[in-house]
C-alpha cells in the first residue's frame, strides 16, 4: 500500500486538534479532501451567501495548495446544500437554493479542467448557519 500523508494546512490545525479529522489525506497521487464549509480559521461561520461559498472554495484551495495540487487536479466534487422551505420559493429552476450563484462562484475556481460533480440537498450541516459543504478528490501528476 502507498504511504498515507496527512494534509493539515496552516490555519486548519484546529479542526484536527478539536474535531480529530484531517482536512486532507494523500495516498499515492490521490488526494482526498474532507468536506469544507464556510467558516474561517477561528471556526466562525462566514456571513453572507456568496461569502460563504467563496470561503468554502478558499478552504478547499488551502488543502490543495498544501498537497501541491490545484483545482485542475480535482476529478470529483460532491456538494451538500442545505435546503428548506425557501427552496420551493427561490430555487427556480433548481430545487437547491442559490445553486445559480454557487455555480458562478465555482466557475471562478474551476477555470480549465472541470470535475465530476454531484450536488445533494440536505436538511442541515454540522453547525447552525452553514449552507454548503464541498468534498473533493484530486489526482496529482506523478512528476
Language-model region placement:
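N-terminal presequence-like segments and the immediate start of the first folded domain
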Residues: 1-76, 81, 85-143
Amino acid at each position: 500500500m502507498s504511504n498515507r500523508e496527512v494534509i493539515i494546512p496552516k490555519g486548519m490545525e484546529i479542526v484536527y486538534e478539536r474535531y480529530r479529522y484531517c482536512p486532507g489525506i494523500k495516498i499515492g497521487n490521490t488526494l482526498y479532501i474532507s468536506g469544507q464549509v464556510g467558516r474561517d480559521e477561528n471556526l466562525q461561520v462566514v456571513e453572507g451567501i456568496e461569502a460563504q461559498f467563496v470561503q468554502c472554495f478558499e478552504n478547499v484551495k488551502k488543502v490543495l495548495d498544501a498537497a501541491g495540487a490545484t483545482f485542475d487536479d480535482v476529478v470529483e466534487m460532491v456538494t451538500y446544500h442545505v435546503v428548506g422551505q425557501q427552496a420551493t420559493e427561490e430555487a427556480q429552476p433548481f430545487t437547491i437554493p442559490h445553486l445559480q450563484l454557487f455555480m458562478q462562484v465555482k466557475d471562478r475556481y474551476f477555470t480549465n479542467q472541470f470535475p465530476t460533480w454531484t450536488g445533494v440537498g440536505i436538511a442541515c450541516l454540522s453547525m447552525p448557519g452553514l449552507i454548503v459543504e464541498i468534498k473533493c478528490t484530486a489526482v496529482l501528476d506523478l512528476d
